[in-house]
Regions:
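Single conserved hydrophobic/aromatic residue that forms the stacking wall/gate
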Residues: 1-5, 9
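Conserved ABC ATPase signature
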Residues: 125-129
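Catalytic Walker B motif of ABC-type/P-loop ATPase nucleotide-binding domains
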Residues: 150-153
Length: 287
């Protein structure tokens, strides 16, 4: 992406994005409204950049047209389906839209539904699937054409913790020999599987690199502090507080600060949640 930008509803939702991506998993992390979905729609040729360009193997994706979309798989945050179609028929419908030959589609659908553990539910109507099942069918349809680029927009939205873990493992399994871009506002979605992390704020990429490099770049330290309950609000006003664990004897605060917040504060290891809080000024959703 070279100086890529996009205006949505007369507001610049994406501004001056510059990055180079290769094979591997890229975690695009940011709060809601940061511009993640707009950027992904640009990468999937749904929205055309108002400025800059997006290249695939040195060629502009809008000029490549269908040749680019043939190597692209996309799972939007909300994807439509005919509720009365069963899983297999839905996959066949998407195969026909993608121009896949029927014999190949039959083999590919069986392979993918087995991979996402949905083959045994192939005759179940889409409207009768759980949220996790729908997401699994969603990633299967995105993989029908064996894409070199797989774009996943908030793929774990609405899933329970067990389904999120299962989905992360599936994404890691599918990432071999392809570029996977996964957007989320939940740190744990990418903490253990992303090769590189991209932090997006106010439509701009404010960091691109590994999790280890991100944590090493933090000048702030992370401290554990035991304080009386009636002092919690004072510390929250003065410091960036990540977690609060209350007990009968008071509260344990996880504080991000360059300086030791109190004499009894204990230094602890930084994690990606701390970096998220430092960059965005708010906590990620449930880990």
């Amino acid at each position: 992406l070279s100086s890529a930008a996009s205006d949505v509803y007369k507001r610049q939702a994406v501004r001056e994005v510059n990055c180079v991506m290769e094979q591997g998993i890229y975690g695009l992390l940011g709060v809601n409204g940061a511009g993640k979905t707009t950027l992904m729609r640009m990468l999937c040729t749904i929205i055309q950049p108002s400025e800059g360009e997006i290249l695939w193997n040195g060629k502009e994706i809008w000029k490549l047209g269908s040749a680019y979309r043939e190597v692209l798989g996309y799972l939007p945050q909300e994807f439509g389906y005919y509720p009365d179609l069963n899983v297999y028929d839905y996959m066949m419908y998407i195969s026909s839209i993608k121009g896949l030959k029927q014999a190949f589609a039959n083999r590919r659908i069986k392979q993918l539904l087995e991979q996402v553990d949905m083959w045994k539910f192939r005759k179940r109507k889409m409207k009768h699937l759980s949220g996790g099942m729908v997401r699994r069918v969603g990633i299967a349809q995105a993989m029908l054409n064996d894409p070199k680029i797989l774009v996943l927009d908030e793929p774990t939205a609405g899933l329970d913790p067990n389904e999120r873990i299962r989905f992360r493992n599936l994404i890691s399994e599918l990432s071999e020999n392809r570029l996977v871009l996964l957007s989320t506002h939940i740190v744990s979605d990418i903490e253990y599987i992303a090769n590189e992390i991209m932090l997006m704020k106010d439509g701009m990429l404010c960091y691109t690199g590994t999790a280890e490099e991100l944590l090493a770049s933090m000048q702030e330290h992370v401290w554990l502090c035991q304080v009386p309950r009636n002092m919690v609000e004072n510390y929250m006003r003065k410091y960036l507080v990540g977690n609060i664990k209350t007990s009968e004897n008071g509260a344990e605060l996880r504080i991000i600060s360059k300086e030791k917040p109190m004499a009894e504060a204990v230094l602890t290891e930084k994690n990606l949640e701390d970096a998220f809080l430092l960059y965005f000024g708010e906590k990620s959703e449930e880990r």
